[in-house]
Structures are given as structure tokens and as C-alpha cells.
Amino acid sequence: MSRIILNTKIWLFVLLFGMSFPAWAQSDDFNTWTKFKVNYKIDSRFSVSGDLELRMKDDVSRLDRWGLTVGGSYRPCSFLNLGVGYETHLRNLGDSDWKFRHRYHITATVSFRYQWLKVSLRERFQQTFDRGDSETRLRSRLKSSYAPTKGIVSPYFSVEIYQSLDDTSFWRANRMRYRPGVEIALAKRWSLDAFYCYQYASSQGRHIAGIEVGYSF
């Protein structure tokens, strides 16, 4: 609980001051992310899911990666959701060189709702394996959204911090994402998430336009 409180304070600081800088120190790239998600609800508490993702990079001139994810979630109570997942990525390294990498993640999400406002805090531990090397990170995401009880459109804004667990300095942010978007209930089983994301990293920033289509049954 103390970790969640501490991360929440950091999130508030980032939200207030993290976007106040007039420019980033590196040249930015424009990317697109496209994802199709399927979710099967076993009962009121358990569900399984899978998704297929395509990412483009270098100002949408080159394929970045294909991604496949499978996972499951358990909701022990109304405000807490626990999940696990496995991901595999086929990445484009350029010069006709491709490689696979694998990742697993463990997630805990706490969410609260007051009238039309919904706020959630997600903590995700992930470990990535890449040609014998491994990378361990903690991803912390704070998300607020307009979620009326009746309606099909829900705009939102989220901020996410990536923190390395491999370094001695824990509070060094490897990556940050600022993401405004809108979720739309297209039909009883279909949903659409359209978003813009700015990803800050020390190597290069990215402007990302994304579409996620979901099907639930």
C-alpha cells in the first residue's frame, strides 16, 4: 500500500510538471500502433484474452514489430483486478534482420468511480528476454476517464512511467507516456479505442497515433 501511495504522489507531480518543458532534447519519430483484442469472460471474476498488434516506425515508412499477447485476469472485488500475460514480439532491426523477444507480466489495477469520473492506478511488473539478455521493469500508469453510466463515448487521459529494476537507481524513469484518447462502445460486443500518445525516452521521443479494436464475448 505504501508503494501505491508513493507512486500516486509521483504521478501527480508528473501530471502537473512533466509536460511543462517547451521542447524535448532529441528528434522525434512518428509511429502508428494498430491492435485487435479479443476477451472472453468465463464468469463474473475470471476472463481470458488475446491480442494481435502491428506497429510502424520511421515516420510510418517501415514496419517496427508484430506482437502477440495472451493472458488472463481475476477480479477478487469490485475495485481490484489482477492479471498475468505472456507476449512475443517479432521486431524489425533493419537490413532484413528480424528477431523474436519474449515477455511475461504481472499486473494489479485499483480503480475507483465517483459519479462520471473513473480513476485507476495500474502497477505492472514485466520481464523481457531478448537473445539471452533480460530486462526487468515496473510500469506505473495513472488513468482518469469520463465514464457516464449511460453513453457510448468515454474520453480519457493517462500517464505512464517505466522504471528499471535492473539498475541501482530505482527511481530513474526509462520511459514516459502521455496518452489522451477516447473509448467508444460500437456495439454490444465491439469497442474502439482511438488515441494519441507521446512517448518520451532519452534516446528518441515518439508521436504515436493508435487504434485498438476490441471484441468481447
What does each model-identified segment do?
Residues 30-32, 64-66, 100-104, 134-138, ...:
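Residues that define the transmembrane beta-barrel architecture of outer-membrane proteins
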Residues 21-25:
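Sec/Tat signal peptide C-region and signal peptidase I cleavage site
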Residues 9-20:
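Bacterial N-terminal signal peptides
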Residues 26-81:
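Start-of-domain marker
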Residues 157, 169, 173-217:
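Predominantly the C-terminal beta-signal and adjacent terminal strand-loop region
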Residues 36-40, 70-74, 106-112, 140-146, ...:
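Residues on the lipid-exposed face of transmembrane beta-strands in outer-membrane beta-barrel proteins
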Residues 52-58, 86-92, 112-116, 125-129, ...:
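Transmembrane beta-strands of outer-membrane beta-barrel pores
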Residues 44-50, 79-84, 114-119, 150-154, ...:
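Repeated loop/turn-to-beta-strand initiation elements of outer-membrane beta-barrel proteins
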